[in-house]
Amino acid sequence: MTGFHFALEDYHGYNRFGNPAKALKAYVDCFSKEELTLDCQALVDIGYEMINHYVNEWLPRRNIYKTLIIDGVPQVEVESSIYIPELSEAFGIPVIYQLKYDRVVTDPDGRFWIQDHKTAASFNISKLETDPQVSAYCWAFPYIYGQTSAGMLYSQYKKAIVEEPRILKNGNISTDKTQNTTYERYLKALKERYGNITFPPKNKEVLDILLEQETPESDAFIRWDRVARNEHNNESEYLKILAEGYEMLNPKLAIYPNPTSDCSWSCNFYNVCLAQDDGSDWEFMINEDFEIRKHEEEIWRSKIQYPQ
């Protein structure tokens, strides 16, 4: 969800729109009605709800991280290129490792964290200890900022709408434990219905379940995980980067297709691949049916209308 990322970039950066929902609207306005399919519009609608929950409910109780600012420039969407001398010398060409940080923050103890925003249908934390992106970003940090980071603040946002607690026909609050709501919203609904007295046992049970989902850095819809990497991790990651580089730049590397059951529906080059195998003019197909993709981000960013 590029628009969601842009909204957070502006909000935690220069905050030119004053509200990330307005930033998302500015992003959407960069596209024509023809370009915004029904699926796109559905994601936009969810994006507004995700932003509302993040800004108005989740963040105010967890706003301990501050965007790093250097010479007046907020460190959001930080693009960097790191020269790799070993590979450059080995192949006789400049070899550059490129990456982009969503945001660099400091915690109350003054430590640096690389924040990475992820939108997904569900949370995934099982991969974090071995995630190569986490490791590579932490390895690169000293080359960019001259000091090590504490690690990555891996931030996940569910593509889901936080709903209000359901109200039954008799006016009572539903005790359905699968409601897509939060502890704060459910508690507010109970107080509005029953006042500050003791709540019905079944409602209290649901409230306790929702409370269990709340931590200093997470709820059922957003969670931030601190993923640490030390100096040894960084050294180990660099060796992997070198190994990958030697393989990628090897002029004698044999490159061949790796067909899977998904090819027929997920690969735009499916017919070209078949043509290459059966002797058809696959080069003609490439030249006639394909073009070099333009840098998508440059296109929409050039259309953003910032407030005057």
Task: Report residues per predicted region.
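RecB-family 4Fe-4S metal-dependent nuclease core
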Residues: 1-308
